[in-house]
């Protein structure tokens, strides 16, 4: 058995022994089968060739380094976002003993950036170790949520404070809504999703992690996010637009060539949808409020170009530079791309820092 497989099984034994009072218990034989026999992802050559043409032009050498990581799923790292509303007895100690460290506390402790004092805890490992997800059980709160740690950047950029009214415009499957609740207790967290299946998934996620005593703070809706700004103008202090995008990791492993070709054709329509969602978010936020726009693609057309076009057409909005301390405090673990134009921040996967892609841009509504 390889060292990574041994570490995986050791971590499972440790974590699940203290989980859910036995509800998630599973034999080591089953776990080994789950880990070793997991089918390999099937690469879509059509999408890869398209990405090679586009990203080699937009990102240069940075693309070829990211490409090596994206083509090797066994190298991908996974973050463990802890649920502060659950019983975490022994869990943090177990993770620490296995070599996990807290992403937001392990580097630059002298920094006074906005990450310094928030209760959010995400543990990461230097190796591509992945513990299994926990099963959903009615009435029991899960202890952790597995995610690409770079997906926390939009939530950190949003910088939610106690009692603020927050809108997560495209919320499913719910990881960023959950992360928001780990940073502060909002006065209201409105989680919206337009797709019925993903809306149901969102509901299940919230039920699995949020205690009944706090669910009155949540509003979960099934609406077209493009209409919310008109329906609720100026209603929110902070708005997150984690926009539908050409998810680079997923699209590379599209199940068949025909579907890959279909997605690439649909890709040209995404920037218009993204701009409309961002404009809706700006209408929904109050003057002085913050909107964060994010995607999980490296595409310039879906990232910088969307933000630039909205800034040019929407009066009373300013692009905010993310604090350098904020970037510095995470640079030991995330690789930030050199963007042209320099609008927002983009994390791209690199060897040893396999997090991303994740683009984030922060906007402030002046009036």
Curated annotation (Swiss-Prot):
Main localization category: mitochondrion
Would you tell me the protein name for this molecule? tRNA (cytosine(34)-C(5))-methyltransferase, mitochondrial
Q: Which organism is it from?
A: Danio rerio
Q: Where is the active site?
A: 296 (nucleophile)
Q: What is its EC number?
A: 2.1.1.-
Cross-referenced InterPro entries: MeTrfase_RsmB-F_NOP2_cat (IPR049560), MeTrfase_RsmB-F_NOP2_dom (IPR001678), RCMT (IPR023267), SAM-dependent_MTases_sf (IPR029063)
Q: Which Pfam families match?
A: Methyltr_RsmB-F
Q: Where along the chain is S-adenosyl-L-methionine bound?
A: 170-176, 193, 224, 242
Matching PANTHER family: NCL1 YEAST -RELATED NOL1/NOP2/FMU SUN DOMAIN-CONTAINING, TRNA (CYTOSINE(34)-C(5))-METHYLTRANSFERASE, MITOCHONDRIAL
